[in-house]
Design a protein with these regions (language model features):
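Gly/Pro-enriched, hydrophobic low-complexity segments
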Residues: 144-234
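A short, polar/proline- and glycine-enriched secondary-structure boundary/capping micro-motif
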Residues: 96-104, 119-122, 186-188, 210-215
Length: 234
């Protein structure tokens, strides 16, 4: 049976403000300890609300920074619901070009082979930067809560924990956090427009430390040729 776990809105909004502030400082838990167990059906509804219903083409500027250097340029991402993504990025004058096609949390191909890992350490974090949450794995323990406008939910597996907070409205946000064996892998915060399309996104990876910023230039419906999912041949 579907569960709707409502909490006092003021409490949840205050909690969310503190949590998102933690994205910029010492990160705390994204989902409150008091969140209750929820059904896969309920989580499925929350996730489905983030998945585009049509093919989308995103164009964006990107900037990657760590303690040693920084690099940036422009890129595009083609998303075919429910879970297929092709991205292409390059620096000035085509330098450092990289491409990859992904289905869910598995790469079909990547050029160069480490194209995804060099920028994003985890596929749920990658998807979150485009405003899309991922479904839980079989056997995950699920918790969540909502006040109708703010939704927070978490999947806990044997070693990994994935958590999301989503807010609606004109300037909505999707925040995602991934932990491995309790250690923070990364946290992504994406600002959304009223239609749910991404406006800007930031990924913070504390272990490097590093951050990746995306500034979206456009989001549009698109028709994709079948060969975009096939790796280019030499």
């Amino acid at each position: 049976m579907r569960q709707r776990l409502f909490v006092d809105r003021g409490v949840l909004v205050a909690y969310l403000a503190l949590t998102l502030a933690a994205c910029r400082a010492a990160p705390g838990a994204l989902v409150p300890v008091g969140a209750a167990p929820v059904s896969r059906e309920q989580v499925g509804e929350w996730v489905a609300a983030t998945v585009p219903t049509e093919h989308r083409l995103h164009r964006f500027k990107w900037l990657f920074q760590d303690e040693r250097s920084s690099a940036g340029g422009r890129g595009s991402a083609r998303i075919a619901p429910p879970d297929s993504l092709r991205f292409d990025v390059a620096g000035p004058f085509g330098s450092g070009a990289a491409s990859a096609a992904v289905i869910g949390d598995q790469p079909l191909w990547a050029e160069p082979p480490d194209a995804v890992k060099k920028l994003v350490p985890n596929y749920p974090l990658m998807w979150a930067m485009f405003g899309v949450a991922r479904f839980p794995e079989p056997g995950d323990s699920l918790r969540g809560l909502t006040d109708g406008r703010v939704i927070a939910w978490q999947y806990a597996g044997a070693t990994d924990t994935v958590a999301y907070v989503r807010t609606g409205g004109k300037d909505g946000k999707l925040t995602a956090e991934v932990r491995h064996a309790g250690k923070l892998v990364g946290r992504a915060e994406t600002t959304l427009d009223a239609s749910g399309a991404p406006v800007k996104a930031r990924l913070v990876v504390p272990s490097v430390p590093a951050k990746l910023d995306l500034t979206f230039l456009s989001t549009a419906r698109a028709t994709f040729a079948p060969d975009i999912w096939t790796a280019r041949r030499p």
